[in-house]
């Protein structure tokens, strides 16, 4: 008998969904009907079309609002599988084993509240390694780094097993904050998270016309910023990411660390696509090849597919 399966890699900003063999990336956001507490108006990317009432139920890689996350998972699962309810759908969720137990339980509770028939939990690092076509059964160690919006995870694999894994509460949002701080300090301009994210995705441009609010008089203001200066500001935000990976390499056994000289480090996750990030890693770890997976954003979901 065939069963309906919906798989989800739940991130703070983006949820990668797998259903019917197809992988899709959706915003981790839900919009409620005006005046209704639990009536969903839209979920995922469609939720951002609503100017008000948009809720982001995941923070720091964990469920900040369990009920809203349950509604989001249920809505996306029904949309992607074509089912009317979640009662016949089996949920496969990627939940980091190194998350504190309380945060793991919150994610699992959201899945239960959504009414899925069953819940299967997978390690996102293992799924990401499979999705990125890493050779897990090689006798030489290979490292995978998953860079999310607000968290980072890292693991080294060899001989079909995990040699080491680590977790950090710093993610690509650290770069957003560095950009926001730069505008505040250099131009007395206040910008939001969404604008900082747009800037981060376009750091290869020569200049930017940025709209924000003046920190002096509170009125709208436009500032033209130099791209080179912004790239320098972004690199300050990347310091924590680089430090985490360097500490991960130092934590390996000497033989496993030496293997990385040939096998390298593979970056996955949405944060891996930041302009200049791979080059920063290469400068700090010049002897180790730094690779960005072609399917970096959906690697974990591809591994579960």
Segments and roles (model prediction):
Residues 1-144, 157-265, 272-294, 298-300, ...:
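Nucleotide/phosphate-binding catalytic cleft detector across ATP-hydrolyzing
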